[in-house]
Regions:
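Cyclophilin-like peptidyl-prolyl cis-trans isomerases
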Residues: 1-242
């Protein structure tokens, strides 16, 4: 389909160095883009995809380690062309550690200002729910004790206390889109709902048309392309020293 070039961010050194190491070792040569979702992202980096047949369910392979999250948000976010690390879900990965090898490139979609406003409210509501749940978990022994003695008044008072604390905590750091995010999401597009949750450590600087070709292929079960889309080779281009 063609070539594309990625630039890696110095502010995410562990992800940068790991990606360079794997590329230089030939780790990515022959791996498939095993998960492709139009207007969302294209994902690769599962080493088991090199030898997988057409019926294999992919996405679990890795080099045997994870990387600590390196969020540089809001400076780096999920605009079109962003390179980010895949990872397992929060329920099993509360630290949001990254896969040691799997990555995705954002394709996304363009949003209107009104759509971003709606999304900001939804994200805010989600964060409030997370704060409330965290408070409840911290006081679970008290909650269970009140439930055991059927202390409904106490439970209701505790709930109101949690609601007030939730509102205060959220008000101290509400979710807002930066001007850079708004400009990007309303022009070139992206996937704003992933911001601050996955490590963004680079971006496509050349050959985005190739990413577009990949995102438009026909896919089947588990969003895997019907016809394999393979990384033939990956090489590292180091900037010339001045």
């Amino acid at each position: 389909m063609g070539d594309f070039v990625l630039a890696l961010y110095d502010e995410t050194p562990q992800h940068r160095d790991n990606f360079v190491k794997l590329a230089e070792e030939g780790y990515y040569d022959g791996v498939l883009f095993h998960r492709v979702i139009n207007n969302f992202m294209v994902q690769a980096g599962d080493p088991t995809s090199k030898t997988a047949d057409s019926t294999a369910v992919l996405g679990e392979g890795d080099p045997g380690y994870t990387l600590p999250a390196e969020f540089v948000f809001p400076k780096y976010f999920h605009k079109r062309g962003a390179l980010a690390a895949a990872r397992t879900a929060d329920q099993v990965n509360p630290e949001r550690r990254s896969s040691g090898s799997q990555f995705y490139v954002v394709t996304g979609r363009v949003y209107s200002s009104a759509m971003l406003d709606d999304m900001k409210k939804r994200i805010g509501d989600q964060r409030k729910q997370q704060i409330f749940t965290s408070l409840a978990m911290e006081h679970m022994d008290s909650i269970k004790a009140m439930q055991a003695r059927s202390d409904m008044a106490g439970l209701q008072a505790l709930q109101q206390e949690f609601i007030a604390k939730t509102e205060a905590q959220y008000a101290a750091a509400p979710y807002e889109f930066t001007q850079e995010q708004i400009e990007a999401y309303t022009t070139v597009g992206g996937t704003p709902h992933l911001d601050g949750q996955y490590t963004v450590y680079g971006e496509v600087i050349q050959g985005y048309d190739v990413i577009d070709k990949i995102q438009n292929v026909t896919t089947g079960a588990n969003d895997r392309p019907i016809a394999d889309v393979k990384i033939l080779s990956m090489r590292v281009i180091r900037p010339e020293k001045k």
